Amino acid sequence: VVAFFPDDTVIISGTPDVIRRYFDRLISKVDKEYIELLTSFRKILKNRNRLLKDILYKRDIIKQLDIWDSMYSDCASALVIKRKQYIEHFNTYFKTLYKELSGFNDDLTIKYYASLHNENVTDVKNELSKKRNIDIQMGTTTLGPHRDVYVIYGNENTMFKSYASTGQRRLASIAMKLSEVSLIYDIKKSKSIVLLDDVLSELDDDRRKNVLQKLIDGNHQVIITCASSNDVNFVDNYKHLQVVHNRVSE
């Protein structure tokens, strides 16, 4: 299931952790190994951070960090490699879809910035070693996949959210969700059930039609909620259900 909601623009203009969680959920839908890596990484990170706090008062346990750093490096390296692979794949859809939906000649691309300078396991261990004193002082792990950032750029390598209007952000968020649908089909060869919860009303007729046409062309099962049937009057064949006072009728 891929759902479109009115507040989806947060994946365009939200904080780094919000956008990172979006891509974590997306990759997890198509890659079971990624879910396992992410789950392991979070447990390792939690234990490492707890140990860092304890070391402030018990310096004699500092050697225990070597064990956690080794596990952390293995997991972090694998996560970064997968994220790079999937964002490259995702961009092949996103660039095209945004142009087709919006009609703008804006060449959008999503860049992934890993806080680790190199995903090689040995290099990750070396980076952790260099940051060890800082990590101990702060009581937390200051680099790794939990600090990674995804940024959307437009023409002339300008950050998209710095100039995008509300409408452009809405279209970009829809383009991201449609890219998600395409990625899932490309990898798993399964059609998504697509849910659109009152996201079409903000679009003009041309762009609303573009979105619906993309979904129709993909032959997906689509469920749309909207305040007015005019939002979907471009579609010829659909089942119309009306909800009045919590009662559903055709």
What are these model-derived regions, one by one?
Residues 225:
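Conserved D-loop beta-strand region of ABC ATPase nucleotide-binding domains
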Residues 197-199:
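Walker B catalytic acidic pair
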Residues 58-193, 202-206, 210-221, 230-235, ...:
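Conserved NTPase motor "head" modules and their coupling/switch loops across ABC/AAA+ ATPases, GTPases
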Residues 25-32, 50, 54-58, 74-81:
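General structural signal for alpha-helix termini and helix-helix connectors
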Residues 1-51:
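Extended, charged alpha-helical "arm/stalk" segments used for dimerization and assembly
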